[in-house]
């Protein structure tokens, strides 16, 4: 039974209510104290706490801060269970927007939607975009789901219609996707003549593969007879972050982004001879390098360094920029090649569903949201219409 006594703290008199909530691992009783200016106030705090326990909340839910729980979640749960890129993204949100914010030291049990909303409004007034705040909200929503599951919160303050992402409708409109014109593609082709990675860039234009998917492609994934390739892995440069925030970079092989990303993509027939020529070049590089060459030119990666190492994203980007500069074509992100592939298919009458499958999007609505002009046609024949770009 709870014990009630008058209590003096800092010269002021309070009512104190003590309740026993169980025993620790050593058998010692666990007690919790509640204070109020009146007995009724102290009792109300006790009942609020006990109701939380009855509803499945953790016994120490009132003592844990958002910052402490988020750090534990990030470094002991997310880092061990999610892809490295996801952890890096989440750690960035934590470091840039939570660690030094007013939310960090707040007891997680008292955080309400209005406090989150005020913080978002403040960020917007400081110049942060709606897109940035929306990404932060998605991050917090995921974290608070964990907090609910672990018994530190009864409900997620970021779900439902409680939170409004600040910003004008005009700001929320996506910017137009970047693509290359037919004339620019011709200039890039010209700049690629004699380049050892010519096949990589033209295959990107001809298949729409993501950068990591191109780098993860192996010779065993290519069927020269059927003129198609199989996407089933990707090479990615990831950031490894320890609990102190120290960073190092590593190139890894991993499975594609989603289930639909694992797919078969037809290769325009005009690119087949170029791929065979690239393979012969790779064989020559192996002979020249001798025992230090690391790749298997029959079963290994299609695109490597001259010594057979995997190509990391940063080095590929440098090469890409040099090629655009040599071609006299304004810089666009590497992903613009993928957008160009999709746009050219749409221009040639390929249906939305087919383009979505070729791109490996997780659902057709993603494709529809990115590309707006769509007309029907057939898959393999559709890709063959790209041949004129390479002749």
From Swiss-Prot:
- Keyword vocabulary terms for this entry: Cell cycle, Cell division, Chromosome partition, Cytoplasm, DNA integration, DNA recombination, DNA-binding
GO cellular component terms, alphabetically, are: cytoplasm
- The chain positions of domain Tyr recombinase read 175-384
Instruction: Cite the active-site annotation.
Output: 210, 244, 335, 338, 361, 371
Report the superkingdom from the record: Bacteria
GO terms for biological process, alphabetical? cell division; chromosome segregation; DNA integration; DNA recombination
Record's subcellular location: Cytoplasm
Q: Which GO terms describe its molecular function?
A: DNA binding
* Keyword Cytoplasm carried by entry: yes
* InterPro entries xref list: CB, DNA_brk_join_enz, Integrase-like_cat_sf, Integrase_catalytic, Integrase_recombinase_N, Integrase_SAM-like_N, Tyrosine_recombinase_XerCD
SUPFAM superfamilies per UniProt: DNA breaking-rejoining enzymes (SSF56349)
Core-binding (CB) domain segment(s): 64-148
Keyword Cell cycle on entry = yes
Q: Additional comments on file?
A: In contrast to other XerC proteins, it has a much longer N-terminal part.
Q: Which family does it belong to?
A: Belongs to the 'phage' integrase family.
General function of this protein = Site-specific tyrosine recombinase, which acts by catalyzing the cutting and rejoining of the recombining DNA molecules.
Q: Name the chain's protein.
A: Tyrosine recombinase XerC-like
């Amino acid at each position: 039974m709870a014990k009630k006594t008058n209590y003096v703290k800092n010269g002021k008199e309070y009512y104190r209510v003590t309740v026993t909530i169980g025993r620790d691992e050593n058998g010692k009783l666990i007690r919790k104290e509640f204070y109020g200016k009146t007995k009724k106030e102290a009792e109300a705090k006790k009942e609020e706490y006990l109701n939380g326990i009855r509803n499945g909340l953790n016994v120490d839910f009132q003592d844990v801060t958002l910052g402490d729980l988020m750090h534990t979640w990030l470094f002991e749960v997310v880092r061990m269970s999610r892809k490295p890129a996801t952890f890096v993204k989440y750690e960035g949100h934590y470091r840039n927007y939570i660690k030094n914010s007013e939310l960090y030291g707040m007891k997680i049990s008292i955080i309400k939607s209005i406090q989150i909303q005020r913080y978002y409004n403040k960020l917007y007034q400081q110049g942060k975009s709606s897109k940035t705040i929306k990404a932060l909200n998605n991050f917090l929503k995921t974290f608070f789901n964990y907090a609910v599951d672990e018994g530190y919160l009864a409900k997620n303050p970021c779900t439902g219609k409680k939170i409004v992402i600040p910003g004008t409708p005009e700001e929320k409109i996506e910017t137009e996707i970047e693509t290359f014109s037919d004339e620019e593609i011709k200039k890039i082709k010209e700049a690629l003549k004699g380049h050892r990675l010519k096949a990589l860039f033209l295959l990107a234009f001809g298949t729409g593969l993501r950068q990591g998917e191109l780098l993860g492609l192996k010779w065993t994934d290519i069927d020269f007879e059927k003129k198609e390739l199989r996407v089933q892995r990707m090479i990615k440069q990831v950031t490894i972050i320890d609990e102190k925030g120290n960073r190092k970079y590593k190139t890894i092989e991993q499975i594609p982004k989603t289930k639909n990303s694992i797919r078969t993509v037809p290769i325009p027939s005009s690119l087949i001879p170029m791929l065979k020529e690239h393979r012969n070049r790779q064989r020559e590089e192996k002979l020249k390098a001798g025992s230090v060459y690391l790749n298997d030119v029959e079963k290994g990666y299609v695109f490597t360094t001259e010594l057979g190492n995997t190509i990391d994203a940063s080095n590929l980007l440098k090469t890409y920029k040099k090629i655009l500069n040599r071609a006299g074509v304004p810089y666009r992100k590497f992903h613009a090649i993928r957008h160009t592939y999709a746009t050219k298919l749409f221009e040639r009458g390929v249906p939305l569903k087919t383009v979505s499958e070729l791109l490996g999007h997780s659902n057709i609505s993603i494709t529809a949201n990115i590309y707006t002009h769509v007309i029907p046609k057939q898959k393999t024949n559709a890709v063959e219409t790209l041949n004129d770009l390479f002749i």
